[in-house]
Structure formats: C-alpha cells, structure tokens
From Swiss-Prot:
A Pfam short name: Transcrip_reg
Compartments where found: Cytoplasm
GO terms, molecular function: DNA binding
Coiled coil: none
Family the entry assigns: Belongs to the TACO1 family.
One GO CC term, this protein: cytosol
Protein name in the entry: Probable transcriptional regulatory protein YE2395
Organism of origin: Yersinia enterocolitica serotype O:8 / biotype 1B (strain NCTC 13174 / 8081)
Keyword annotations of the record: Cytoplasm, DNA-binding, Transcription, Transcription regulation
Primary subcellular site in the record, as a coarse category: cytoplasm
Amino acid sequence: MAGHSKWANTKHRKAAQDAKRGKIFTKIIRELVTAARLGGGDPGANPRLRAAIDKALSNNMTRDTLNRAIARGVGGDEDNNMETIIYEGYGPGGTAVMVECLSDNRNRTVSEVRHAFTKTGGNLGTDGSVSYLFTKKGVISYAPGLEEDAVMDAALEAGADDIVVYDDGAIDVFTAWESLGAVKDALDATGLVAEGAEVSLIPSTKAELDAETAPKLLRLIDMLEDSDDVQEVYHNGEISDEVAATL
C-alpha cells in the first residue's frame, strides 16, 4: 500500500525533539505510572503498559528509569489522582484534532487546550465531534532501507492488520492496539529492528492543508504539546511536499 511522505504522518514530530527530551520523558513516565496503577505491572497482561514501555524504549529511556516508574505506579504512592482526558476539536483548515491528556486538574487542562485552539483559529468541540474519524491502532515504524516484501511477509505472519510504505521508504506496520506488543515481539524475532512502536489514533480521512493553514496547524500542535498535561496530539491534516517546502 503506497503512502504519502512522512511529513504528512498522523502526528507531527518536531525536528528539534532533543530540546524537549526532558518534557517528553516526564510525559512518558507519567503514562508508565498511570498505566501500571490502573492495570498492574505485568506488561503481558496490561496492553496500555506494554505500549508505554515500547514508547519509552523508542525514546531511548533506560530500563532502570522505566522500571522505577512502573514500581511507583504499582505501589500507588504517586500520581494517584491522574486521569486520562480526551479533548476533540477542529483546527485550521477544517482539520480534526484529538488531544490526549493526563491531568489532576480538569479545569486547568481544558483552559490550556481551549486557549491553543482559539489562538490558532480553531475551536474546541464536544465529545464525539471528531472522534468518529479516528481508529485506535498499534503502529510499529521502520526506517527507510528495508525490503518491503520481507517486512510485509513478516508482518502478516505476525498478525498485523496493514502496512504502509511511504515515499521516502519508511514503513509503518499497523496492528490492533491490544496486539501491539505481541506483533512487535514476533517482528523483533525475525531480526527486523523497529525505529519505534506506539498506540496511535489513525484518521479515516485527510484534510489537505495549504501554505496558509499548514503553519497554523503546526503552531496549534506546538502549543498543545507545550502543555505539561498533554500526552499526545493526533490530527488528520495532510501537508504536501510542495507546501512543506515553503514552511
């Protein structure tokens, strides 16, 4: 299955991610603690925890750090009042945007999220306003350079749902989100080395952005990700190579 450039992937990743490494680690640790608190410390029986572990390792977090976070969650000593909140809204260019948060203060979080939407010309929606456009999936990503047929055969044998090969040669393998850990283990066993693995919300439709709306969407994502309460931002915006070259 052919795909567009990685620039137009489901989630925008900042090029200067290293500058936000500390904040990224803080958010991953918060998710590890919460997942372990809610579902226990065994990743084999806790898909949410397994997904958080895969994400932590993809971001080069040490085993010691993630194990301490899991122990905190199982012990129930910290972050025991954190709750997952999903906000939905419309961004620039009619894009559908989903914002996944972990928060101990709903009023603070919704205020920050609403402010980001308002400042970039979007608006915060009600529950169900755009969520029907997204499906929760596991995503295992591979860097360019692998043989497409080899990845496809291994992925299908492992129980994957779909494979997308992008113009730059990168490959994403999609799974049921609950099966992410098992499928990744099976692919690892074949010798394929994944660049990353995570649970994501995949849009069923795309909204094409132009030179005016694309920068506004990227600003919205930046503002949302700057919030300590925001864990993930998903959207259905698509930026063509031509528009991307002007940014």
